[in-house]
């Protein structure tokens, strides 16, 4: 693939995730948008690793590390969201007033 096409696609994914993260009022949707941002970053890592230095796999290995961290972040985030839903019966961000108590 051409480098510019992949970078434009990655930028679109990043901007869609950023827009969703800023405008989202639902915690699950915010977590999904955060994962979209991380996938755009992973796409950049793999693209630049392949384009600039094909003999070394530093970008690919770092991408796998980011995927592992993102999986742990998603599991912890969903556990927190399910706990908040059990206690508050809502997953809306503006209705969670956990810091006010």
From Swiss-Prot:
<keyword id="KW-0472">Membrane</keyword>
<comment type="function">
    <text>NDH shuttles electrons from NAD(P)H:plastoquinone, via FMN and iron-sulfur (Fe-S) centers, to quinones in the photosynthetic chain and possibly in a chloroplast respiratory chain. The immediate electron acceptor for the enzyme in this species is believed to be plastoquinone. Couples the redox reaction to proton translocation, and thus conserves the redox energy in a proton gradient.</text>
</comment>
<keyword id="KW-0150">Chloroplast</keyword>
<keyword id="KW-0812">Transmembrane</keyword>
<comment type="similarity">
    <text>Belongs to the complex I subunit 4L family.</text>
</comment>
<dbReference type="GO" id="GO:0030964">
    <property type="term" value="C:NADH dehydrogenase complex"/>
</dbReference>
<protein>
    <recommendedName>
        <fullName>NAD(P)H-quinone oxidoreductase subunit 4L, chloroplastic</fullName>
        <ecNumber>7.1.1.-</ecNumber>
    </recommendedName>
</protein>
<keyword id="KW-0520">NAD</keyword>
<comment type="subunit">
    <text>NDH is composed of at least 16 different subunits, 5 of which are encoded in the nucleus.</text>
</comment>
<dbReference type="InterPro" id="IPR001133">
    <property type="entry name" value="NADH_UbQ_OxRdtase_chain4L/K"/>
</dbReference>
<keyword id="KW-0793">Thylakoid</keyword>
<dbReference type="InterPro" id="IPR039428">
    <property type="entry name" value="NUOK/Mnh_C1-like"/>
</dbReference>
<dbReference type="GO" id="GO:0009535">
    <property type="term" value="C:chloroplast thylakoid membrane"/>
</dbReference>
<feature type="transmembrane region" description="Helical">
    <location>
        <begin position="32"/>
        <end position="52"/>
    </location>
</feature>
<dbReference type="Pfam" id="PF00420">
    <property type="entry name" value="Oxidored_q2"/>
</dbReference>
<keyword id="KW-1133">Transmembrane helix</keyword>
<dbReference type="GO" id="GO:0042773">
    <property type="term" value="P:ATP synthesis coupled electron transport"/>
</dbReference>
<keyword id="KW-0618">Plastoquinone</keyword>
<dbReference type="GO" id="GO:0016655">
    <property type="term" value="F:oxidoreductase activity, acting on NAD(P)H, quinone or similar compound as acceptor"/>
</dbReference>
<keyword id="KW-0521">NADP</keyword>
<feature type="transmembrane region" description="Helical">
    <location>
        <begin position="61"/>
        <end position="81"/>
    </location>
</feature>
<feature type="transmembrane region" description="Helical">
    <location>
        <begin position="2"/>
        <end position="22"/>
    </location>
</feature>
<keyword id="KW-0874">Quinone</keyword>
<keyword id="KW-0934">Plastid</keyword>
<keyword id="KW-0813">Transport</keyword>
<keyword id="KW-1278">Translocase</keyword>
<dbReference type="GO" id="GO:0019684">
    <property type="term" value="P:photosynthesis, light reaction"/>
</dbReference>
<dbReference type="GO" id="GO:0048038">
    <property type="term" value="F:quinone binding"/>
</dbReference>
């Amino acid at each position: 693939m051409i480098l510019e096409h992949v970078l434009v696609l990655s930028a679109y994914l990043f901007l869609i995730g950023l827009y969703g993260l800023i405008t989202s009022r639902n915690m699950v949707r915010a977590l999904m948008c955060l994962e979209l941002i991380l996938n755009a970053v992973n796409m950049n890592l793999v693209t630049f690793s392949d384009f600039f230095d094909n003999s070394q796999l530093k970008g690919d290995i770092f991408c796998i590390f980011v995927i592992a961290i993102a999986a742990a972040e998603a599991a912890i985030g969903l556990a927190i969201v399910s706990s908040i839903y059990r206690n508050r019966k809502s997953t809306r961000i503006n209705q969670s007033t956990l810091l006010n108590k």
